[in-house]
């Protein structure tokens, strides 16, 4: 109840499209599941993924491949948890973001460096004066909103390296 996230349990129904593609099944499993905790220190993560074939275009890797979905999921969970706890979502993010490196996630991903806390502070500073702009917009019949989200992007694909040595 103090806002410390201790676990994340995710069940995903993943659309693989109409046929098996090169890396289609790896997107909702390896590429998605490994980054589910985002840039938050969550010690326990459970991911259950069921892939289904549909009558849509086959899914394959292109720009991000599973990571945008994982980041969206954890950020929505943070927003919902903050609402249910009656806590400011930005405060909840700051409380749970990891700051020590290297950081090993519950799903086996090692993040070697980052400055997530600094990025949040920079975003808050960049939004200075937002309330005044919101009030001004409201007088003109326009609505403004402000949201924060963290995004973790890994620099490589699969979490392993392969080499073959021949003599």
Please report, for each region that a protein language model flagged, where it lies by residue.
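Predominant activation on well-ordered alpha-helical scaffold segments within soluble catalytic domains
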Residues: 43, 71, 75-79, 90, ...
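Long hydrophobic segments that form regular secondary structure
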Residues: 61-102
């Amino acid at each position: 109840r103090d806002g410390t996230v201790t676990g994340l349990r995710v069940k995903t129904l993943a659309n693989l499209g109409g046929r098996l593609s090169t890396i289609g099944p790896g997107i909702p499993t390896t590429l998605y599941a490994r980054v589910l905790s985002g840039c938050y220190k969550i010690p326990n993560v459970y991911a259950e993924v069921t892939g289904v074939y549909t009558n849509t275009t086959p899914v394959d890797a292109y720009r991000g491949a599973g990571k945008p979905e994982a980041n969206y999921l954890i950020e929505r969970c943070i927003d919902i948890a903050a609402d249910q706890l009656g806590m400011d979502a930005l405060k909840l993010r700051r409380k749970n973001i990891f700051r020590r490196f290297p950081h090993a996630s519950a799903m086996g991903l090692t993040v070697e460096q980052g400055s997530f806390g600094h990025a949040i502070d920079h975003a808050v500073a960049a939004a200075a004066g937002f309330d005044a702009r919101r009030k001004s917009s409201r007088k003109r019949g326009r609505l403004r909103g402000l949201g924060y989200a963290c995004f973790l992007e890994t620099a490589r694909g699969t979490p392993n390296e392969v080499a073959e040595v021949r003599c």
